[in-house]
């Protein structure tokens, strides 16, 4: 629910990754293609799509060198551009459909591209680094094809492909959703974090703690927290491991069974053949596919196990802020998920081993984990914990990369006209933000066809979007309602001018 449904035909969605620095000479054009979906299109078709995209990028750079092409609206398609790395471009082409459900916001689609790239870098390193490591492009293709394909599987429900639609306008991909803690619970969490950070002796670890699909604590930077949070909600939390789909989690989970043909994960013969070194440092030639479904399970000791990295191998990730590699250990107790990051350098140097770290967690943190889970469960208000009667809202803190929103079940009660008006409102805000290229305070109010007020307020990096369906309200009544919400739930972060 809430995602624009698209058929699985090749016209519905095309997604490509290409390098502008490659394939500049005649006969070498295929070298620039690093990924293309669907992969069974002819090379001439793929080159045609990428050639058009490259031309648009080159042309728009003449007028805006610092910010090239972002979106092109054609009669039948929308072309969404994202420069993931210098001269490494991702382009999504979506078919325009007369069905009302196929109404989307361009920034929401671009956030899909940004998310899949960020997750890829977290597990495999940057695309440019892989190209420098193996210049033919075979290495990076061998990782991009299965990784993005596994990610796209989450956009399938049955045989229908789903993209973020106007029904998702009160959600914000690329942010984390946090659990509000009472003071006593916060103190218990702080104590637990201290124990986790010291589980590797003198080597400092990092930790991320989740309760259900909400963030409780993190010692990572906001960007790294967003990436690890997204992956945790997709594959690691209790909701992700269960067969059912969480109805209130922001990230929509796929059906659990691959819907994209297996040939989509096979690398087209563009690069060199033969066994390739792994992008994450493995010399076995194994292609790591961390986004595969049903590959994680809970062991007897409470730690999650997987064979994705190989039998008895420990998962690894790369942290953006420090460019440091870590082992990823995940411990689970009831609805509490603890992700512990241990520096690989410490293990390689023989200072400790993974089994020792796990034992330290079990011996030193078990009691604190039980206490934290108990306190969080007692204070937990359930799926509708952040529902505010009479309001349907989205609150975003761009500096902290945190968001909070009305529960999906409550948002679903809004009329279609209200959601469409909200989507249009957010598009106007996106346009203003892109035009100014800097933080801008503003307020926009729109009255929908069904007399619903939809309102946006932006102030000092924070954004508030709201729908008020009381048809009798005047503009003054609506703005007063927003102000009351701001004062009570946002610490007055959105004052009236």
Curated annotation (Swiss-Prot):
Cystine bridges: none
Family: Belongs to the CCZ1 family.
Pfam families the UniProt entry points to: Intu_longin_1 (PF19031)
Protein name, as recorded: Vacuolar fusion protein CCZ1 homolog B
Function recorded in the entry: Plays an important role in membrane trafficking through the secretory apparatus. In complex with MON1, acts as a guanine exchange factor (GEF) for RABG3F of the RAB7 protein family. Promotes the exchange of GDP to GTP, converting RABG3F from an inactive GDP-bound form into an active GTP-bound form. The RABG3F active form is involved in protein trafficking from prevacuolar compartments (PVCs) to vacuoles. May serve as a linker between Rab5 and Rab7 protein families in PVCs and mediate PVC maturation.
Domain of life according to the entry: Eukaryota
Taxonomic lineage: Eukaryota, Viridiplantae, Streptophyta, Embryophyta, Tracheophyta
Alphabetical keyword list: Endosome, Guanine-nucleotide releasing factor
Record bears the keyword Lipoprotein: no
InterPro entries: Ccz1, CCZ1/INTU/HSP4_longin_1
Chain positions covered by the region annotation Disordered: 244-284
Keyword Zinc: no
Subunit and partners: Interacts with MON1.
